[in-house]
């Protein structure tokens, strides 16, 4: 078991290190005309000649917007616009953009040059098709899988890359895996650097910092979990399987009741039998559920998608998990 966990530490650290080196190599000479693709050289020449206004970028999904916000921090010539309310759940964004948010989206799209989407893994993502109605020249940047195919896309739960159903994406959000979050950041920077080459150095610096933070968090968490006596967790939400799988945690077996009134009893039984160190969820539970978890001595860890900084949110969740796994359980708990 120890060897297996040690191998997981080395494998995860290698993956993040590979992405860090790949992104650095990709942008080592962003202004070079010798190595740039013909399309890139043309785009850069046009951008240099016409860059009187900043490059305006649209985003709707909370994780995509939050990640872009971190990458664009301090980047001159780039303006990020959010076209969906900050606290709107992802599954309600398509209806919002097709309804009461459509006029605002159209107004923003007319003045924008790019949109950040997840259409390759989220077919219900309507941001680009709607924005294109207002602006035929707007460019789509799919941050899950690049259109050109020159860089690998993210990996979905189960080892499959590529398209997924809407329910599959919402129930298995790939960005809970730090390697996928790093890939999304790299794909975003790759495309934006080509559209706004003058911002490439700052974008690359922000990407490098994010990669380093994720790599350090994964390394620390993997080492701590390799030394833990047990790795049992309780998943209050099915969508937390991605994080549990990425960290090779051991979810206890229990069935979430369809009737909310039956939840406290079922949860109390699962906590007593499984004795998990951590309870994972994507949203704050009600008071009764939170009290049951506290009384069991399990640590409640919430990883929300509706955050302005998904990188810090994931790092904080990993830190809370490793600290909980290192803390001895109270007697008779």
Spell out what each predicted region is:
Residues 11-24:
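Bacterial N-terminal signal peptides
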Residues 2, 27-333:
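Extracytoplasmic metal-acquisition and chelation regions
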Residues 1-8:
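N-terminal secretory signal peptides that target proteins for export/translocation
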Residues 7, 14-16, 36-38:
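Intrinsically disordered, low-complexity repeat segments enriched in small/polar residues
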């Amino acid at each position: 078991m120890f060897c297996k966990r040690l191998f997981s530490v080395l494998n995860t650290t290698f993956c993040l290190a590979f992405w860090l080196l790949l992104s650095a190599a990709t942008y080592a000479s962003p202004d070079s005309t010798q190595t740039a693709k013909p399309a890139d050289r043309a785009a850069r020449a046009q951008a240099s000649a016409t860059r009187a206004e900043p490059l305006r970028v649209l985003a709707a999904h909370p994780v995509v917007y939050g990640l872009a916000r971190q990458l664009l921090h301090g980047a001159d010539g780039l303006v990020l616009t959010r076209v969906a309310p900050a606290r709107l759940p992802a599954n309600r964004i398509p209806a919002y953009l097709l309804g009461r948010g459509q006029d605002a989206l159209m107004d923003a799209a007319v003045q924008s040059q790019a949109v950040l989407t997840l259409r390759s893994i989220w077919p219900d993502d309507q941001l680009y098709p709607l924005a294109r109605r207002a602006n035929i020249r707007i460019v789509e940047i799919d941050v899950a899988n690049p259109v050109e195919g020159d860089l690998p896309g993210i990996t979905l739960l189960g080892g499959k890359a590529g398209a997924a159903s809407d329910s599959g994406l919402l129930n298995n959000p790939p960005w809970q895996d730090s390697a996928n979050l790093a890939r999304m950041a790299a794909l975003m920077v790759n495309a934006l650097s080509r559209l706004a080459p003058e911002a490439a150095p700052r974008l690359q610096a922000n990407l490098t910092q994010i990669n380093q933070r994720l790599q350090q968090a994964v390394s620390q968490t993997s080492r701590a979990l390799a030394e833990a006596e047990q790795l049992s967790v309780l998943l209050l939400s099915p969508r937390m399987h991605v994080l549990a799988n990425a960290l090779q945690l051991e979810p206890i077996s229990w069935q979430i009741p369809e009737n909310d009134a039956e939840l406290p009893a079922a949860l109390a039984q699962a906590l007593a039998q499984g004795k998990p160190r951590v309870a994972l969820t994507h949203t704050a539970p009600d008071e009764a559920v939170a009290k049951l978890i506290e009384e069991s001595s399990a640590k409640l860890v919430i990883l929300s998608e509706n955050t302005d900084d998904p990188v810090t949110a994931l790092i904080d969740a990993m830190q809370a998990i490793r600290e909980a796994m290192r803390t001895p359980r109270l007697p008779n708990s």
